[in-house]
């Protein structure tokens, strides 16, 4: 497979310009205007942030992309699907309220918001996965599949289960209905190391399934209630909650890649990622820890696999921030350094599996040429 082209611009802005100007120029240079959008529905998939989290992308970025679509005659809308776990985005009404509270509305973004899998997270379409090994079909939000054109606008950051969350996670996990998310997460559930557990109850507060109790002042997980979402792993500050089966995370990664293929296959798609506020964990948390790496820039491509690879490569070259989860890990005298910022931040992850699987089934390629946009 030939190399894909990924376009990049940094966040430096001379007087008289803005990041929004640079984002628009990046998208235009990358070829967004080559897509025929006239009179067509354009789904812009992004994450509206959990209440309390402040690392999610600002609505201004969404408006920049939506405005470009409207200039081409497109009919854009922002979308995301409901969460698997209870929280502020578990149904469409609360999800929309959360989006509004975090600044996303028709005025701030220039387009409407549609929750992709409907009121209860059950409005889904069963979509074939071409060349799928782990999923023959994917359960995707109906409104997302109804769109003529698909654009992902992703916040690239760390993740406690997948290593990082970029375009493929935004698409694969994010576009899955609640049942689709469950099918992806079903491959593994966390465990507790009692020797490390301090009974602080942070994991129970983060759990959306009421699956964690403390009968002996140590966390105990009820696996009949646990959905395997992994939020408790990110909540624990003492590494007491962990994934006992590293292959479970790898299986999650590969399923996620196949779901992303189901979303993109057979229609025009374009992808943008902003590598900033690189928190160690998912934006699904109701909080965000300090960034583990400095802000890097914005990337765009027609190939989501190459895009994620380029973002990851840029992060791996960056210098860790000392006062962060990653910096603290690396400063430990007994820390086994993986020479991989994502794995050193969250050790029980296998992020390369997502890219490997996506490339294997033909969604894109990990080989890319990086072009700089000034």
Cite the ranges covered by each PLM segment.
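Extended, low-polarity segments enriched in aliphatic/aromatic residues
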Residues: 2-61, 71-80, 85-374
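Terminal amphipathic helices with adjacent charged low-complexity linkers/tails
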Residues: 66-67
């Amino acid at each position: 497979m030939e190399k894909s082209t990924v376009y990049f611009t940094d966040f430096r802005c001379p007087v008289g310009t803005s990041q929004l100007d640079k984002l628009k120029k990046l998208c235009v240079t990358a070829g967004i205007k080559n897509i025929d959008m006239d009179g067509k529905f354009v789904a812009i998939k992004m994450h509206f942030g959990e209440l309390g989290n402040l690392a999610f992308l600002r609505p201004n970025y969404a408006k920049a992309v939506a405005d470009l679509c409207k200039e081409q005659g497109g009919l854009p809308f922002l979308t995301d699907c409901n969460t698997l776990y209870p929280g502020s985005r578990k149904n469409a009404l609360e999800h929309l309220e959360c989006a509004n509270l975090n600044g996303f509305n028709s005025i701030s973004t220039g387009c409407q918001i549609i929750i992709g899998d409907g009121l209860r997270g059950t409005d889904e379409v069963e979509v074939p996965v071409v060349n799928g090994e782990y999923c023959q079909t994917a359960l995707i939000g109906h409104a997302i599949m109804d769109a003529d054109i698909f654009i992902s606008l992703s916040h690239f950051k760390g993740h406690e289960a997948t290593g990082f969350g970029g375009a493929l996670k935004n698409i694969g996990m994010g576009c899955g209905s609640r049942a689709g998310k469950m099918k992806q997460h079903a491959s593994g559930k966390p465990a507790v190391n009692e020797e490390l557990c301090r009974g602080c109850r942070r994991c129970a507060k983060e759990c959306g399934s009421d699956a964690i109790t403390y009968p002996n002042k140590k966390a105990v997980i009820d696996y009949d209630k646990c959905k395997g979402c992994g939020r408790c792993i990110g909540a624990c500050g003492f590494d007491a909650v962990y994934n006992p089966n590293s292959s479970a995370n790898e299986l999650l990664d590969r399923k996620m890649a196949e779901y992303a293929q189901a979303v993109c296959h057979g229609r025009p798609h374009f992808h943008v990622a902003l590598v900033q506020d690189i928190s160690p964990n998912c934006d699904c948390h109701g909080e965000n820890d300090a960034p583990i790496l400095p802000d890097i820039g914005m990337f765009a491509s027609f190939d989501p696999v190459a895009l994620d690879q380029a973002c990851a490569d840029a992060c791996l070259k960056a210098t860790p921030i000392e006062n962060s989860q990653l910096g603290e890990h690396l400063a430990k005298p007994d820390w086994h350094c993986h020479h991989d910022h994502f794995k050193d931040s969250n050790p029980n992850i296998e992020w390369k599996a997502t890219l490997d699987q996506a490339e294997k089934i033909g969604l894109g390629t990990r080989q890319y040429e990086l072009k700089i946009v000034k």
